[in-house]
Curated annotation (Swiss-Prot):
Enzyme class (EC, first level): isomerase
Top-level taxon of origin: Bacteria
Keyword Metal-binding attached: no
Family assignment from sequence similarity: Belongs to the triosephosphate isomerase family.
Pathway as given in its UniProt record: Carbohydrate biosynthesis; gluconeogenesis; Carbohydrate degradation; glycolysis; D-glyceraldehyde 3-phosphate from glycerone phosphate: step 1/1
Chain's gene name: tpiA
Organism: Latilactobacillus sakei subsp. sakei (strain 23K)
Lineage: Bacteria, Bacillati, Bacillota, Bacilli, Lactobacillales
Name the record gives this protein: Triosephosphate isomerase
Length: 251
C-alpha cells in the first residue's frame, strides 16, 4: 500500500513572513504523517522559516531545486549538502519550468537525483509532455524517455523510495486539468517504465503524483485512480484552507 503524498509547490511566491503565517494556520489540522504525507515546496529563501515553523508538526519540507555539486564556485546555486544539513526532506527536480526557462537537461536532472540521494533526501522527479507532443500522439513515448533518462544509474532501493510527478505542461497553471483518466493513463506508463527498467516490485513501490491544475474540487477523483498516489500542486496550495482541503482529500 503506497502512502498518499500531497505536495504544494509554491514556486517563486511567498516570503518568510507569509511562510510562517501559513504553517501556523495549517499545522494543527494536518493529517497524521503516517496516513498522508503533507509537503510544502518553497523557495530556498523561505526554507529556514518553513523548517522552523514545521518543527514538531506533520508537515514535510521540500526545496524546489538544488545543484548537483555539493560546494564550489557555482554562484547562485543551492547545495544539496546544505539542504540536508538544514533538515529538508524532499527536493523537486526536473520541473518543466526549470527545464524550459533554465534549460536544464535530462543529464543535469539525473545528476541532481544522484546528489539528492547521496545527501539523504528524496527527489520528487517531474516529467511531462507539451501540448504539441501530446497532439502529435507522442506523450507516452516522451514521458517514458524522460523517466528512463532521469533514473539512470539509480539503485532499485532508491527508485522504490522516490516520488515521480507527472505534470503535463499544458495543464500547469492553465486551469486546464488533464481528466482523471488522462492523468491515470500516463501515470500507468510511468509505472510500466519503472517496471521495465527495474522490476514490478520497484514499480509497485514508487509513488507517482499528478500535477497540473489540481484543486480541492478535483483532487478526490484524481487520487482515486489506481496509479496516482499523490498531487503536486501549484496555485491551489497557496491558501491555507485550500491546502488543508487537498491533504484531507480522503476525509
Ligand atoms: O508543480 C506544480 C505544478 O506546476 C502545477 O501547478 P498548478 O497546480 O498551478 O497547475
Amino acid at each position: 500500500m503506497r502512502k498518499p503524498i500531497i505536495a504544494g509547490n509554491w514556486k517563486m511566491n511567498m516570503n518568510p513572513t507569509q511562510t510562517t503565517e501559513f504553517v501556523n494556520a495549517i499545522k494543527a489540522n494536518l493529517p497524521k504523517f503516517d496516513q498522508t504525507e503533507s509537503v510544502i515546496g518553497a523557495p530556498a529563501v523561505d526554507l529556514p522559516a518553513l523548517l522552523e515553523a514545521a518543527k514538531g508538526t506533520d508537515l514535510k519540507v521540500a526545496a524546489e531545486n538544488c545543484y548537483f555539486e555539493e560546494a564550489g564556485a557555482f554562484t547562485g546555486e543551492t547545495s544539496p549538502k546544505t539542504l540536508n544539513e538544514m533538515g529538508v526532506d524532499y527536493v523537486i527536480i526536473g520541473h518543466s519550468e526549470r527545464r524550459d526557462y533554465f534549460h536544464e537537461t535530462d543529464e543535469d536532472i539525473n545528476k541532481k537525483a544522484h546528489a539528492i540521494f547521496k545527501n539523504n533526501m528524496t527527489p520528487i522527479f517531474c516529467c511531462g509532455e507539451s501540448l504539441e507532443t501530446r497532439e502529435a500522439g507522442k506523450a507516452e513515448e516522451w514521458v517514458s524517455n524522460q523517466v528512463t533518462e532521469g533514473l539512470k544509474g539509480l539503485s532499485a532501493d532508491q527508485v522504490s523510495s522516490m516520488v515521480i510527478a507527472y505534470e503535463p505542461i499544458w495543464a500547469i497553471g492553465t486551469g486546464k486539468t488533464a481528466s482523471a483518466d488522462q492523468a491515470q493513463e500516463i501515470c500507468a506508463v510511468v509505472r510500466q517504465t519503472v517496471a521495465k527498467l527495474y522490476d514490478q516490485t520497484v514499480a509497485d513501490k514508487v509513488r507517482i503524483q499528478y500535477g497540473g491544475s489540481v484543486k480541492p474540487a478535483n483532487v478526490k477523483e484524481i487520487m482515486g485512480k489506481e496509479d496516482i498516489d499523490g498531487g503536486l500542486v501549484g496555485g491551489a496550495s497557496m491558501e491555507p484552507a485550500s491546502f488543508l482541503d487537498l491533504v484531507h482529500f480522503n476525509d
